[in-house]
A protein has these predicted regions:
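Conserved NTP-donor binding/palm subdomain of two-metal-ion nucleotidyltransferases/polymerases, i.e.
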Residues: 2-132, 138-370
């Protein structure tokens, strides 16, 4: 198949798999340019708050807050307000750790940019969401100094190439993910840092200061993260959050510089990943991006190959990783029983990650995806 045909086929699969029918319906009307009482009533008529996933309830609570003119039934209004209150209190402990770390880094001094959900908390303080940790980025030359300072404060690191993920003490409770670059799996990730820091603005966070990315960088990071979520088969909640964030930033387009987003994608080698993520968003929000944003990428054979790679990672690699569970081999030998099936899955993953393009397509065909 040609590039565009493959792209369309994969987008159809993703649209049906990633979000449930109820979630697609909710996004389509909740993020529409205008929301009517009739569309809300029609949705609520077949909606059961007891059966609905948490992210959908949160999106409805946002809708209630942004559209005070809409009338919600008495049976659901207290629950929707309660979700916002729950998220606000859930974040208190996390942000207490964040502000303590921010103050420490500012005293060194080490500049840091807050990313993703932490940044949205600053952009939209009245719209809390559940967060497991807060992502921050520092200059590469400051990374080890920042990591040592945070570790000296009693936080325990899980060390990766692009970040150290700090938990609270010896617990598994997340606190801060310290990045030297934002992972994109292109080998060019660090090229984003200079512009990201230069365009960010300083904001006060309790007893410390941090840098907040500009709107354009937030949109770029959201699209890259969406691509990762699609290929990694993460929960629909992360995808819903991306739609909410993009609607917030793209609904306020005055002075929005699309060239920054394009330049970020070019520098980091993520043009196709960003275009695919934008194309996925456009299946539900058709007017989110300007007509020329995707350019000719979607018609290229390269885009088709990237779509099949996304599908391979999502349907073949990610489920096997989830089945393996424990990634640290030494820890696995101490804790996993029986060990032989675990070893077999690790060997299988090793070879599946190293197959060529034709073999990957053949595996997808055998599974019925293409």
């Amino acid at each position: 198949m040609e590039g565009r045909a493959v792209v369309n086929q994969v987008l159809t699969i993703l649209t049906q798999e990633v979000l449930a029918a109820e979630e697609r319906q909710l996004l389509s009307f909740a993020l529409a340019p205008s929301v009517s009482q009739e569309s809300l009533d029609a949705f609520l008529e077949g909606w059961d708050i007891e059966e609905s996933p948490f992210p959908s309830i949160l999106l409805l609570s946002y809708l209630m807050k942004t559209h005070p003119d809409l009338s919600f039934p008495d049976s659901v209004m207290p629950r929707l307000k309660g979700v916002l209150t729950y998220c606000r209190f859930q974040n208190l402990k996390l942000f207490a750790h964040f502000t303590k770390i921010a103050a420490k880094l500012a005293s060194l001094p080490i500049a840091m940019v807050v990313l993703k959900g932490g940044a949205m908390k600053i952009y939209r303080p009245d719209f809390p969401r559940w967060m497991g940790d807060i992502d921050i980025l520092v200059h590469e030359q400051d990374f080890h100094r920042a990591a040592e300072a945070i570790e000296a404060m009693g936080y325990s690191p899980l060390k990766c190439a692009h970040s150290w993920d700090f938990s609270i003490g010896e617990t598994q409770e997340g606190a801060i993910d310290l990045h030297r670059y934002f992972q994109m799996n292109t080998g060019k990730e660090s090229s984003l840092n200079e512009g990201l820091f230069a365009r960010a603005r300083e904001v006060n966070v309790a007893s410390g200061k941090c840098l907040l990315p500009c709107r354009e960088d937030m949109v770029f990071i959201s699209l890259v993260n969406l691509y990762k979520n699609l290929s990694g088969k993460t929960s629909s909640g992360s995808v819903l959050n991306t739609f909410i964030d993009l609607d917030y930033f793209l609904g306020r387009r005055d002075g929005f510089d699309w060239d920054i987003v394009r330049d970020n994608a070019r520098k980091t080698g993520t043009e196709i990943q960003v275009s695919l993520a934008a194309a996925f968003v456009s299946t539900l929000l058709p007017h989110a991006f300007p007509e020329d944003f995707l350019g000719g990428w979607m018609d290229s054979d390269l885009a088709g190959r990237q779509c099949l790679e996304l599908l391979y990672q999502r349907e073949i690699i990610s489920p096997l990783r989830a089945e393996i569970g424990v990634t640290n081999v030494i820890k696995a030998f101490k804790t996993v029983r029986p060990i032989l099936p675990y070893i077999g899955r690790r060997i299988r993953l090793f070879f599946l990650k190293r197959t060529g393009y034709r073999t990957r397509v053949a595996i997808l065909k055998k599974k019925g995806y293409v």
